[in-house]
Amino acid sequence: MSNEIKQIHATCIAIGDNGILLRGPTASGKSDLALRLIDAGATLIADDRVDLILGSKGVCASAPAILKGLLEVRNIGILQFPSKENAFVSLVCELVRPEEIERMPQYTNTCILGINLPHVLIAPFETSSVTKVQLALGLITGSIKLAHDKS
């Protein structure tokens, strides 16, 4: 297990103990979606840059010290929010345009630091995007099931 930190351009929030990594290009809506998730009860881990390290339970996300607790709220400013020190990443949300998402997508994984993590595409500015992130996490944690899943 390497103690090497990899810093990426992303945002990370936590729902309970589950870290959710929001990835996408500049101005794709990472901070905006994080703000709405925080409003729905999530906790900020890191905005704009996320430090990732391989830990005993998987990929652990944290904020660089200079950015701890800070979230950019476009047209308002950089604001201080309550935050968690770190969280293990349970879900990676790739922020894309709505037309890039299949109506009934196949579930995929993405590899980060040699660990395969569940990966979904999210259109961040859709009204339902916060709920979709919560539902995707529920599928991963087993708190909800797909209609065709009989297990």
Regions found by a protein language model. Give the residues of each.
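Short solvent-exposed loop/turn micro-motifs enriched in small/polar/acidic residues
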Residues: E4-K6, I45, E102-R103
